[in-house]
């Protein structure tokens, strides 16, 4: 299966090499295996465990343009072709840049970089000129689609600067820096807003407020392979002895979560499982917010003024996320974007290729 799935990239790299050679520039095509990319054994969603790009480096030294098929590598144990899953091509590019000691890894897409919000929802979103890898990770993890989370994680781990730009324009894109930047007076407090419709809300009602019960619940979910995004536990009512735990989980894991918890309702004394698939998450991201306590007040006031109810709230040092009704998510993004003065005076975002990436 992986051999078949990787065929498209192999054909594309070969055709591109032929075209470049015909234009009078030497070019050499490499499969992931030929480029020295080794993976673990998780077929279809493998991780890169090593890169030895000797042939790629030699081709470049000899004046050839090296073209490497993304999304694939060689299983470290079996030497079989393996595929990397979502974000595999971006991650391949970053891995090669790191192993070759490149000054920068440029990721080409169909827009001029990262924007303060999805331009399809907020046409006046601003282009972000520079952003930290930590902020980019938060945006990517909470719905921003331009750059995949795995690629950003790899870049941060190996200190590879990223430049995200358009394939159809010479404009400067967005620089993602991995070194710690000094805070300045001019530094933006908020970098951007991400939104995500791919999570469902599950509330576990009537959990005993005693040591061990929450641990048992999350052990069951982990055993079923359920991924969890947000966790919120209510404070137990005085004298009641029970609490509620609310989760947001990727929609593909909802059935497994409900099944495993339903089977343990009697054991754990759970009184009810409440499932809501009609929710969306808005995440406000910015390294500057940690020293500005008014940020959360402005966020909640903007949602209040727009008449939007909040289901759940979670946060990190540089992010505040709120779960709202799905049919009000776009309104929430626009309201918060305007409240934090992120709107541009004119439309900056242009989708050149229409791929939606």
Identify what each model region corresponds to:
Residues 160, 165-167, 171:
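Internal glycine-rich alpha/beta core junctions
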Residues 155:
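Acidic-aromatic/histidine active-site loop/patch
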Residues 173-357:
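A conserved regulatory-domain signal marking ACT and ACT-like small-molecule sensing domains
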Residues 34-36, 112-114, 170, 236, ...:
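Positions that flank functional sites
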Residues 25, 102, 160, 226, ...:
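Short glycine/serine/threonine/alanine-rich loop segments
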Residues 104-108, 162-164, 229-230, 311-312:
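Short hydrophobic alpha-helical runs that function as membrane-insertion/retention elements
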Residues 1-152, 324-325, 344, 351-357:
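Nucleotide/pyrophosphate-binding catalytic subdomain
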């Amino acid at each position: 299966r992986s051999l078949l799935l990787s065929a498209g990239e192999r054909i594309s790299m070969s055709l591109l090499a032929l075209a470049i050679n015909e234009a009078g520039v030497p070019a050499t095509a490499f499969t992931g295996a030929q480029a020295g990319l080794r993976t673990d054994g998780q077929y279809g969603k493998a991780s890169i465990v090593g890169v030895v790009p000797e042939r790629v480096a030699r081709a470049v030294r000899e004046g050839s343009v090296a073209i490497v098929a993304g999304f694939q590598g060689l299983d470290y144990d079996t030497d079989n072709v393996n595929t990397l899953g979502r974000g595999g091509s971006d991650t391949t590019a970053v891995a090669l840049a790191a192993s070759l000691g490149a000054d920068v890894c440029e990721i080409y897409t169909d827009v001029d970089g990262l924007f303060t919000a999805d331009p399809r929802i907020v046409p006046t979103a601003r282009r972000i000129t520079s952003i930290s890898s930590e902020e980019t990770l938060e945006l990517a993890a909470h719905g921003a689609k331009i750059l995949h989370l795995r690629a950003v994680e790899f870049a941060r781990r190996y200190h590879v600067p990223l430049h995200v730009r358009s394939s159809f324009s010479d404009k400067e894109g967005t620089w993602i820096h991995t070194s710690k930047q000094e805070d300045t007076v001019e530094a933006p407090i908020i970098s951007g807003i991400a939104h995500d419709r791919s999570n469902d809300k599950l509330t576990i009602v009537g959990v005993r407020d005693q040591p061990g019960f929450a641990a048992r619940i999350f052990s069951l979910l982990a055993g079923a392979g359920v991924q969890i995004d947000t966790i919120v536990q209510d404070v137990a009512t005085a004298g009641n002895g029970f609490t509620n735990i609310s989760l947001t989980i990727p929609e593909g894991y909802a059935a497994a979560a409900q099944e495993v918890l339903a089977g343990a309702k009697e054991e754990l004394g759970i009184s009810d499982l409440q499932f809501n698939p009609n929710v969306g998450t808005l995440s406000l991201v910015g390294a500057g917010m940690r020293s500005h306590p008014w940020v959360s007040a402005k966020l909640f006031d903007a949602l209040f003024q727009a008449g939007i109810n909040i289901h759940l709230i979670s946060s990190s040092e540089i992010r505040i996320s709120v779960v709202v009704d799905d049919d009000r998510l776009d309104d929430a993004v626009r309201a918060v974007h305007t409240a934090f003065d992120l709107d541009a005076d004119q439309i900056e975002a242009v989708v050149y290729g229409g791929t939606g990436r």
